[in-house]
A protein has these predicted regions:
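Alpha/beta-hydrolase superfamily serine-hydrolase fold, recognizing
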Residues: 1-245
């Protein structure tokens, strides 16, 4: 945050136009970019939010359940949740509680915070491959580890950790937002729901969804592991930067 503010405040010294500053990142970096944009709003020209994790309230999304079947020994590994427990300063054994959505209390599951990640409201059916998951989308709400919830309640209510739960006024002040998601990514739905929410609030936003893509696909635009999907993703990002900055 301090670095971005310094760049914006010292454009002349740095030889850049502060009106043309963009921020972006992928995965956890996408989360960071979105969080910084929540604070700086339209001081930024645009944000690139690529295969982002944008909420920690619901780990039983359709995308999570669909895609842990694939690449689950690498980028879609359930062990990835340990990164989250480390970030929250929790022992790794709590990761399993998150996977079951047992980290939130029964009352929290019925609160406005879960409305922000309600897939009936924010997840278009066209992105879902598995009809059975869509048909059985409604989750039980009468359970939860109250002790764990009390430990992390502040984190669960913090939009700088979960930008998807930010209030409408804050989200409505965001700059142009380019969101990239991949069909075989277990955090796929976060970016799609973010796009739908911004659209609802009349924020200028574009979603680039690659049904055949996976979480790190943008890392393969060249070299011995070059993939067509990697080339396409990077080309689309370049197009956005050229057209919007």
């Amino acid at each position: 945050m301090d670095v971005v503010e310094y760049v914006l405040d010292n454009g002349k010294t740095l030889g850049i136009d502060p009106a043309r500053v963009a921020i972006g990142g992928d995965s956890a970096g996408g989360n960071m970019a979105a969080a910084i944009s929540l604070r700086l709003q339209k001081k930024l020209a645009l944000q690139l939010v690529l295969v982002p994790v944008l909420q920690i309230q619901n780990w039983q999304t359709i995308g999570f359940m669909e895609n842990t079947l694939y690449l689950n020994k690498s980028i879609n590994s359930l062990d990835s949740i340990v990164f989250l427990t480390n970030y929250l300063n929790l022992p790794p054994e709590y990761a399993y509680q998150f996977l079951l959505n047992n980290h939130t209390s029964s009352s929290f599951k019925k609160s406005k915070y879960l409305d922000s990640v309600d897939q009936r409201k924010w997840m278009p059916r066209k992105y879902v491959r598995t009809k059975e998951l869509w048909d059985n989308l409604d989750h039980k709400k009468d359970f939860g580890n109250e002790e764990l919830f009390r430990k992390i309640e502040g984190h669960l209510k913090e939009p700088l950790i979960s930008p998807l739960i930010a209030d409408d006024e804050t989200l409505g002040g965001l700059p142009f937002t380019y969101i990239m998601t991949c069909g075989f990514d277990f955090i796929r739905d976060d970016g799609i729901m973010f796009h739908e929410k911004l659209k609802h609030l009349k924020v200028d936003t574009e979603l680039a969804h690659y049904p055949e893509g996976f979480h790190n696909a943008l890392m393969f635009p060249h070299g011995p592991l070059k993939m067509d999907i990697g080339v396409k993703i990077v080309a689309d990002i370049v197009r956005i930067l050229k057209n919007k900055l």
